[in-house]
């Protein structure tokens, strides 16, 4: 049986803020390229989702399934190409400063009849354009894997959690995507 390990990867944005996606890698891959804390890496993989039914932590768990890992050059690069279908009606809203923002869930098919359900967020004109789309319509995009912390209110108090989503940079023709995450 294949065994897997997971680890966080810090990717700095131009703003200086960090995104920290969770990487899932096979032990065989990690033997070829051992990972050490603080090391610069180049990872190519797929963004995956699964429902956590344990009642502990986030209900939707988003990870990057590493297909290749190699030493990085110290530069930060976070790019993902996705192609899928909208599986919920897009929700358009405005920020307190009046900027358009749209939340969508994209269903991305993978092998063996499985699909990943990935939360995505668009801004400005892209948000307005996506908000006019219908459930089931195809959407191809380029973006980045983004993480943000929030406080979840529970009966027993509150808990700090991290949400992962794809921040959409631009829409693409479907032929331009490979459903690959580059970190």
Residue ranges and their predicted role:
Residues 1-183:
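Single-stranded nucleic acid-binding surfaces, predominantly the OB-fold ssDNA-binding core
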């Amino acid at each position: 049986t294949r065994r897997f390990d997971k680890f966080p990867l810090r990717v700095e944005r131009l703003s200086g803020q960090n995104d920290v996606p969770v990487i899932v890698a096979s032990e065989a891959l990690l033997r070829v390229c051992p990972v050490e804390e603080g090391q610069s890496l180049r990872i190519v993989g797929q963004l995956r989702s699964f429902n956590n039914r344990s009642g502990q932590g986030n209900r939707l768990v988003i990870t990057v399934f590493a297909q290749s890992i190699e030493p990085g050059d110290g530069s930060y690069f976070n790019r993902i190409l996705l192609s899928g279908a909208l599986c919920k009606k897009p929700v358009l809203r405005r920020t307190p400063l009046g900027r358009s923002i749209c939340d969508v869930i994209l269903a991305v098919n993978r092998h063996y009849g499985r699909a990943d359900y990935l939360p995505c967020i668009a801004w400005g004109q892209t948000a307005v354009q996506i908000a006019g789309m219908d459930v089931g319509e195809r959407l191809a995009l380029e973006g980045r894997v983004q993480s943000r912390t929030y406080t979840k209110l529970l009966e027993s108090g509150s808990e700090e959690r991290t949400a992962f989503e794809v921040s959409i940079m631009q829409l693409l023709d479907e032929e331009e995507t490979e459903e690959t995450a580059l970190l």
